[in-house]
């Protein structure tokens, strides 16, 4: 007896729409339902400082050179210097004094690139004050430096020896002519 098999292609569609299924992406939706308003990018309609212009001042570039941190403020007195030094000691930084006899302000001599590194080098006053725990020790060294170089610029630096970076630097003394 002969047996015969007949195969016919059968196409079936399985629709498993369960509760956790996400609907398929059908394209971008119309923006007709969303509010569309063209925004005005002109900020002059929002802000007005016309009344404040009278009390604004311009930094005078003549006779007012830019130095380091805090250079735009009036000179620091001994109590304010002591607070700055106490701050850098609290942070665990090592105080160091540097002085410059000719150019205390930014100028270009050895380097033509922009930025903080402007090619000027200051002379270190003695050695960094490793192990210093009292601000009066730093102020005593500052007085010695002022006595030795009354016409020089003197700055105090806070150096982080772990990260090996200078963390703070400010002018502690300027010559009387400045």
From Swiss-Prot:
GO terms for biological process: photorespiration; reductive pentose-phosphate cycle. Its main location: plastid. Signal peptide: none annotated. Heterohexadecamer of 8 large and 8 small subunits. CDD domains: RuBisCO_small. It comes from the Eukaryota. GO terms for molecular function: ribulose-bisphosphate carboxylase activity. InterPro entries: RuBisCO_ssu, RuBisCO_ssu_dom, RuBisCO_ssu_N, RuBisCO_ssu_sf. One of its GO terms (cellular component) is chloroplast. Gene3D superfamilies: Ribulose bisphosphate carboxylase, small subunit. It is found in: Plastid, Chloroplast. Residues 1-54 form a transit peptide. It holds the Pfam family RbcS. The basic functional RuBisCO is composed of a large chain homodimer in a 'head-to-tail' conformation. In form I RuBisCO this homodimer is arranged in a barrel-like tetramer with the small subunits forming a tetrameric 'cap' on each end of the 'barrel'. It comes from Glycine max (Soybean). RuBisCO catalyzes two reactions: the carboxylation of D-ribulose 1,5-bisphosphate, the primary event in carbon dioxide fixation, as well as the oxidative fragmentation of the pentose substrate. Both reactions occur simultaneously and in competition at the same active site. Although the small subunit is not catalytic it is essential for maximal activity. This is Ribulose bisphosphate carboxylase small subunit, chloroplastic 2. Belongs to the RuBisCO small chain family. Keywords: Calvin cycle, Carbon dioxide fixation, Chloroplast, Photorespiration, Photosynthesis, Plastid, Transit peptide.
């Amino acid at each position: 007896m002969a047996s015969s098999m007949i195969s016919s292609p059968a196409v079936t569609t399985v629709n498993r729409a369960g509760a956790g299924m996400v609907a398929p992406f059908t394209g971008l939706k119309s923006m007709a339902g969303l509010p569309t308003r063209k925004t005005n990018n002109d900020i002059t309609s929002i802000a007005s400082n016309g009344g404040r212009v009278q009390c604004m001042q311009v930094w005078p570039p003549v006779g007012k050179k830019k130095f380091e941190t805090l250079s735009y403020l009036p000179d620091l007195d001994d109590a304010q210097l002591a607070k700055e030094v106490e701050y850098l000691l609290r942070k665990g930084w090592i105080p160091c004094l540097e002085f410059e006899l000719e150019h205390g302000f930014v100028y270009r001599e050895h380097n033509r690139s922009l930025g903080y590194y402007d090619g000027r080098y200051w002379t270190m006053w003695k050695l960094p004050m490793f192990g210093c725990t009292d601000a009066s020790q730093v102020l005593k060294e500052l007085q010695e430096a002022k006595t030795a170089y009354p016409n020089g610029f003197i700055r105090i630096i806070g150096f982080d020896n772990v990260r090996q970076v200078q963390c703070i630097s400010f002018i502690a003394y300027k010559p009387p002519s400045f």
